[in-house]
Amino acid sequence: MKIIQLTDTHLVEPGARLYGMDPCDRVRQLVTHICEHQADADLLVITGDIANDGNLDAYRQLREVLSPLPMPCRLLLGNHDRRDTFLEAFPESPVDENGFVQSVQDLENPSLRLLFLDSQAPGVIGGIYCADRLRWLHTRLQERSDVPVVVFLHHPPVPHGMRHFKHIGFHDGESVMTLLRAHPGGVRHIIFGHIHVPLSGVTSDGIPFSAGRGSNHQFIPGFDDPTPFWTSAPLNYSIITLNEEGVFVHGYDMIECEGIVRARNCLGP
């Protein structure tokens, strides 16, 4: 299975700009590139902060921008989003029995369960995963206890070393990780956004994770700086491949450049 990840698109109302950039135009360029070069993907996931302030017109604008995509989309919520206006613009988005925007998708080859989590809470920058959501996650893990999972969400439930996010990370992340660690089928990968910079790593107990780069703006990495600078970034998305050999995450930066010399076909030894 091939999945495209976008994250932290931060769309604003039509005609507005954010940090001097047009978030909608940037997503439109990404969609055009994905249609031209990744049309064989099975799914596109946006891992939260879809709109910068939960504006209904921003969500409606995104719906129009995404319409050329040949693959289905799963849209997840981040702290900048609003669940009510998002669902008004995307009423077909799957929700759980309590109205949270979270769902599962089961794969046969490879045998995996994809979990899409909702860590948004009104008025809170950090992630919240309340008792109702924890019960939902526990049930989804128990339903197929022998099947490994890949988890998508906005807030990182793992340490990432960015001081700016020390107090606005995933407040209930350890509760989520406790359930995931106990899953007999194991956790193949956790994929998130929120921190706006590309990141990959593995927890001390062996769970791999990665973050995508924000599609509109990112930080100039200053890991110990509580007030790092925002900057523009190359248009980018992540290409996630799930197969019997594992989980592979490739960052694709749309940097305009010309080929110099074509590499030869290296057949070994």
Language model: regions and residue ranges:
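Extended active-site neighborhood of metal-dependent phosphoesterases/phosphodiesterases
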Residues: L56-E143, D172-G186, D205, T227-T241, ...
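Active-site neighborhood of phospho(di)ester-bond hydrolases with catalytic His/Asp-centered motifs
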Residues: Q5-T7, D42-D49, C73-N79, D118, ...
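His/acidic metal-ligating clusters that form di-metal
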Residues: L30-L43, G127-P208, I239, V247-F248, ...
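Active-site-proximal beta-strand elements of phosphoester/diester hydrolases
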Residues: K2-E13, S111-A121, V150-F152, I207-R213, ...
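Active-site environment of divalent metal-dependent phosphoester hydrolases
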Residues: V12-G15, N52-D57, N79-L87, P122-I125, ...
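Binuclear metal-dependent phosphoesterase catalytic core
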Residues: M21, R28, L179, L199-P269
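Short glycine-enriched, charge-decorated loop/helix-capping segments at active-site entrances
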Residues: A16-D22, E92, M162-G169, D225-T227
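N-terminal active-site segment of His-dependent metallophosphoesterases
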Residues: M1-Q61
